[in-house]
Every structure is written in C-alpha cells, then in structure tokens.
Amino acid sequence: MTQNEKYIKSFIEALGVEKKIVNENLKYNEIPEWDSIGHMTLISDLEKEFKISIETDDIVNLSSYKEGIKILKKYKIFK
C-alpha cells in the first residue's frame, strides 16, 4: 500500500466515509463526519498508520486533505 493509499484509508476509517468523499477538496467541518471528534480520531489514526507523533500546531493546522499532505511532508511521509 502506498503512502497516499494509507492516507486516504485513514480518512475513510476515521471519519466513516466512502472513498469518493476523500479528495483534494475535502476540508474540516465541510462534512458532518469531520467535526472536532472526527478530527481527533483522524489524527490518532494518522499517528498509528504512519508511526509518528503529530505536534499540537500541526493538529490544529490540519484543516483540509491538501493541508494534511503538506503537514505529513514535515514528518517525511510524503516527498
């Protein structure tokens, strides 16, 4: 499984949404599933999936699918 596939899988599992919902336009609070609880579930899932510990500022700043990729580059998950 590629890093991108793992990233998408984390959104699907943490938010309980279908794959078609997870795309570059997805943003925090744009769907009911990505509320504050869904956000923390997503963070937890990303940390487990990629074996990282996400810093507090990055947790707050992960406000969209695209922003998440930028943040994960910092942790050398994406290039």
Language model region names:
Residues 2-34, 38-43, 48-79:
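Phosphopantetheine-dependent thiolation modules in NRPS/PKS and related acyl-activating systems
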